Amino acid sequence: MKIGVTVHKEGKLYVAADPVTGVTSQGKTCDQALKNFQEAFELWYECAEDWEKERALKGEPVATLVLDLNV
């Protein structure tokens, strides 16, 4: 299964997240965050309803953008 995962840094931790399912995990390194994410996603998948799994398969993000907003 292929899904879109974003990784960003929050303080000293890396955060990996799937915006479609809401599954999120973190780690001290990018690799650790992704490893933890895979474990969290597998646990989510075991408990997810069929319609949630179908949405996850169809829900590839179109783009991830970095915006510089003046607020």
Residue ranges and their predicted role:
Residues 1-3, 35-71:
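Short, charged, surface-exposed hinge/linker loops at domain edges
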Residues 3-20:
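Short aromatic-glycine-(Arg/Gly/Cys) micro-motifs in beta-strand/loop hairpins
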Residues 19-22, 62:
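A detector of low-complexity, intrinsically disordered, Ser/Thr/Gly/Pro/Ala-rich segments
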Residues 21-31:
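A short, exposed loop/beta-hairpin motif centered on an aromatic-Gly-Thr core
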